[in-house]
Amino acid sequence: MRILQLHCDSIEYTPTKKEIKSAEEIENPQTQRLEEIVVAFVAIEDGDDSSVAKNAISQIKNSMEKIGCKKLLLYPYAHLSSNLAKPSTAMSLLQEMESEASDLEVSHSPFGWTKSYKVQVKGHPLAESSKVVTKDSTTKDDDEDTSDALKGESTIRSYWKIMSPDGTMINIGDYDFSNHKKLEILAKYESAKQRQVDEPPPHVALMKKLAIADYEPASDSGNMRFFPNGRLMKSLIERYVTDRVKEYGGYEVETPIMYDSEHPSMVSYFNRFPARQYNIDSEGKKLFLRFAACFGQFLMANQFQMSYKNLPYKLYELTRYSFRREQSGELVGLRRLRAFTMPDCHAFCKDIPQAVDEIKVRFDLSQSVLKELGIDESDYDMAIRFTEDFYNENKSAIEELVKKHGRPVLVEMWKEKFFYFVLKWEFNFIDNLGKASALSTDQIDVENGDRYGIEFVDENNTAQHPIILHNSPSGAIERIIYALLEKAADDSKKGKKPQLPLWLAPTQVRIIPLKEEFYDFCNNLCDKISAQNVRVDVDDRNESIGKRIREAEKEWIQYILVIGEKEAGSENLSIRDRQTGNVREVSFDDFMNEINEQTSGKPYTGLNQSQHLSKRPQLMV
């Protein structure tokens, strides 16, 4: 069955003549006008049956609930398919669909008639959608263990709204997105929950071109290999995020990557966490690879004797790796992986008021971390999800988070609590293909303190279970690199020269000698610059000067020093600045200060390849 679904201000249609002998009988055909309605143009295909009809109506009703519309017109529309069912079957299934939708204000246009029509479609992100519904639409892979939370994620009742910084909430169908195009993309992407990849985003080509990462064909899909350049970048981001979390007060730990699937806490948690896991059999024991740091940290916290005076108490781990068996059609580049590196900080709080106060601190931390990583607030949009009860009891706290963001946010409100958390927010990056990916996130978890037997003693010397916050201030490290590359691709599209933040550049300065007679000078200069904690290399290959400069440009190296007789005899350095395209002379000290201004406060590591390009192998990607 194929469906084109439109949320309309109005539709007018007029039956003009019968197309087939078995067309529906109607008396006195007249123009019909319907307003504020969802119109489902439906083509019943050969092989469709009652199960398909029920599934189709279920999907239509689910999307109508999200936009707050209860008025439906079923419009038979054969032009959507070339594989139509027999007219008798089609009419019967349309009647079944209308019956299944009897709790709505439902009607249908006559079957088998030629009709003229005029339709006015609304302009919000969910106003237009298409569906292909088959008997297998809801079938899952036989070898896939799927949590109850994951199964329920597609059926949970959600209300989608937009909240402004002043706290007002508007139904998504009534919001004017004209000044918030990225938020509109996020709203459509999240509410439709379509993660399929149609084409690779630009960062995939860039991660290969810059020798950062590539697919590993000898591994499972979604498991990447990082070349020396990529490992250097990744390690610096890991160190920076870890340093910031430790400054915030997180205590770093290390926990196993696999756990007993039959451990009571694990079984219960599986069914409250929306993720697919890798399963392992070891000597008859069923194990799974962790999909977050929660398990190890919670089992560790179970061994602590805590007082309310210790709270909020924060544990932190950088998981290398966390594993999630994302569906194969959703995997692409560094955006969505099956093995990824996740900074994960849990805060154990006394109660909801303390958790609400702490989540504000972590919100500020997350904004700051992203900014220092090279991702500004204008680069992402915020989504926040909560239960209706939690919103009613903590409205001002939620509004404060939105006010901190400073722009309208996407809201998903749940009628009832289905997951272990009652609130979750995330910052979502929108890439060049209009796909959203969560970076920073935090959750308020009201179940796992009890589930894992974690306790603290309150003011009355009574044992209590803590509220737990789940924060990743950056999101997966791989996604940070993805976002930086997508930003660079967007800059290139706008005519700007793409670049990485200087502190993450695998090579920050390249020295190119004009002739072999300047090699000693270049090597000494290289050592002098390197001693200032700057990643510098020497292109001593037997290639033309033009080719070596072009290749440095292709590697996005910000500073190029071409050394000839004039430069070797000068007290100043002649610097080619990639961003301006200009060559300028500066003193050594001024040049070092310029670099330091861009890298100050960030971790440093030396080159992850030979200092001389002549000694490097050529990477074939």
Swiss-Prot record:
GO terms for biological process: threonyl-tRNA aminoacylation. The gene is thrS. It catalyses: tRNA(Thr) + L-threonine + ATP = L-threonyl-tRNA(Thr) + AMP + diphosphate + H(+). Residues 598-612 have a biased composition (Polar residues). Its cofactor is Zn(2+). Its EC number is 6.1.1.3. Catalyzes the attachment of threonine to tRNA(Thr) in a two-step reaction: L-threonine is first activated by ATP to form Thr-AMP and then transferred to the acceptor end of tRNA(Thr). Also edits incorrectly charged L-seryl-tRNA(Thr). Belongs to the class-II aminoacyl-tRNA synthetase family. Zn(2+) binds at C294, H346, H470. The N-terminal domain is an archaea-specific tRNA-editing domain that hydrolyzes incorrectly charged L-seryl-tRNA(Thr). Catalysis of tRNA editing is performed by the charged tRNA itself. It is found in: Cytoplasm. InterPro entries: aa-tRNA-synt_IIb, aa-tRNA-synth_II, aa-tRNA-synth_II/BPL/LPL, Anticodon-bd, Anticodon-bd_dom_sf, DTD-like_sf, Thr-tRNA-ligase_IIa, Threonyl-tRNA_syn_edit_dom_arc. Binds 1 zinc ion per subunit. GO terms for cellular component: cytoplasm. Homodimer. The lineage of its organism: Archaea, Nitrososphaerota, Nitrososphaeria, Nitrosopumilales, Nitrosopumilaceae. Keywords: Aminoacyl-tRNA synthetase, ATP-binding, Cytoplasm, Ligase, Metal-binding, Nucleotide-binding, Protein biosynthesis, RNA-binding, tRNA-binding, Zinc. GO terms for molecular function: ATP binding; threonine-tRNA ligase activity; tRNA binding; zinc ion binding. Its main location: cytoplasm. Residues 1-137 are annotated as: Editing domain. The keyword Membrane does not apply. PROSITE patterns: AA_TRNA_LIGASE_II. This is Threonine--tRNA ligase. Gene3D superfamilies: Anticodon-binding domain (3.40.50.800), Bira Bifunctional Protein, Domain 2 (3.30.930.10), D-tyrosyl-tRNA(Tyr) deacylase (3.50.80.10). Residues 128-150, 598-621 are annotated as: Disordered. Residues 202-501 are annotated as: Catalytic.
